[in-house]
Amino acid sequence: HIYMTFACPLSLGQESECECVDVKTEAEAPDFEQWKAALNAIMPAGIVITHVGPVQMKADLIAYACYRITYPAAAAAALDAYNALESAPVEKHGKKGNKIIELKDHIPQVEYITEGDSLHIDLCMPAAQELNLNPSLLTGFLEEKFGLPAVSANILRKKFLTADKQLFV
């Protein structure tokens, strides 16, 4: 029997360079390279398994997920307007019901870099069991408040960090 636990499942419409899944097997000495080859053989186009190995850190050590959000360069006006706000309340939908989260507590300012006709935002958001925030809260707020279409954002998860901001491996 195989038992699988997905840490921080990715939301629909988002991309990731770092997915992690813990697999528990009864095999005493699994051949990780064989697992990697077998998994890659059945993955959809564009999805590549880059590493299979013994657990180094338990999934509950994940505290933050870091993202790169790419918008058209014209989004700068909405981001500047967000930065000028004192408060940015959003409704977070969860298993225990909905609650209001103050985005400014977690993203006080949105820093961005413009490259040609795009701009990039690099940010880390809480991804712990106690509090898990999705970047779609920000993109949804920007759409609702400033008319910046959330669908114009490309959201790419880059890495996970522990509570002390070390790379989760």
Segments predicted by a language model, with ranges:
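A contiguous pocket-lining binding segment that forms or flanks enzyme active sites
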Residues: 66-101
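Extended basic-aromatic, gly/pro-enriched interface segments that bind polyanionic ligands
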Residues: 41, 48-50
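Glycine-rich, charged/polar anion/phosphate-binding loops
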Residues: 7-9, 51-57, 94-97, 106-109
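Helix N-cap motif at beta-to-alpha junctions
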Residues: 26-32, 72-76, 128
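Short, charge-patterned binding micro-sites
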Residues: 1-26, 55-58
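Short amphipathic alpha-helices in soluble, non-transmembrane regions
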Residues: 33-43, 78-87, 137-142
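Core RNA-modification/binding signature centered on pseudouridine synthases
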Residues: 87-169
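Short glycine-/aliphatic-rich beta-strand segments at the starts of folded cytosolic domains
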Residues: 19-23, 63-71
